[in-house]
Amino acid sequence: MYEQCVLSVNVAEVAEQKAVQRKIIHVDMDCFYAAVEMRDDPALRDVPIAISGRSARGVVSTCNYLARKYGIHSAMPTAHALKLCPHLTLVPGRMQVYREVSQQIRAIFERYTDKIEPLSLDEAYLDVSDCEMLHGSATLIAQDIRRAIEDELQLTASAGVAPVKFIAKVASDLNKPNGQYVVTPEDVDSFVADLKLEKIPGVGKVTIQKLHEKGLYVGRDVQNYDRHLLLQQFGKFGQSLWSRAHGVDEREVIVERQRKSVGVERTFSQNISSFEQCWQVVEQLYPELEQRLRKVRPELDIAKQGVKLKFADFQQTTVEHIYPKLDKTQFVDLLKEAMTRQNDREIRLIGLSVGLEVGLKAQQLSFGF
């Protein structure tokens, strides 16, 4: 007699789990590395490119959509990619630049929620269940995030919106590039019923072959399959698959380590240069910084506050001073000091930050963040 798996979930439990509704957004940048290169070098925008280094040795990290038309994809050997597309332009990766852009994207996310789970430099889960902006509509929030990314960074992102993580991730891929797909709580059952099992995260090539051998191709097939038999045949994975096929995913958005700083920043579509222009931006950013800080430090207690400037040549400078409480007037001196390093360069980004660490030495700190 089969011993019932302790992880088994009955129908009543499924209903109970579905009753806990969350608003999850999965944001996935469109061919991120390649998009950054095309943004920064207009000569690359109308040709097939791959991020891979200059030689035929190695593998493709990512490629743009023009290259994908030739059948090129990530993890493909570069030599094979060149056979498919002899005029493919190989671009060496600039990981430091990608990390900086990823931080800018993260800063946009943080305007809406602190519940952010990065999966890589170019994708993340956001839980916006408690966000009151845009009437609390996850659909409108996702649209606004994508608009901000495009307006401020000249990059596009796709998004999936759903009550659970795995459906949000699947949905983000359905209207690529530069689109989004929403699965409402009412649509979950029909969505997963028609979902091909290979689209479920964690279902690989070997597993899908075994599922096909059992006559399991879409979520509906699993819904109609004997649950105990599924657990016998696939163990813990069978439990997970059965839950996913019923639209259940109890995983929460995992927030990173305890916050050590709070910051806001803006990248401009047109560079600026004067103190008056910069201070106007600071005045726009400050209320957002204060609001976000109050969520973690209601009394506005801090260890330091700083200003970051990024110039038109992509070099950046940061000035930070020790302060016990957030003080808007201190940003005047910080901004002036940062602008002494301008050297006639225009400014493309301004950031404000506060550090929450304690026990810092009473001295000026000046470094990138």
Language-model region placement:
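Gly/Gly-Pro- and Ser/Thr-rich, intrinsically disordered tail segments characteristic of DNA damage-repair
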Residues: M1-Q233, Q239, L360, Q364, ...
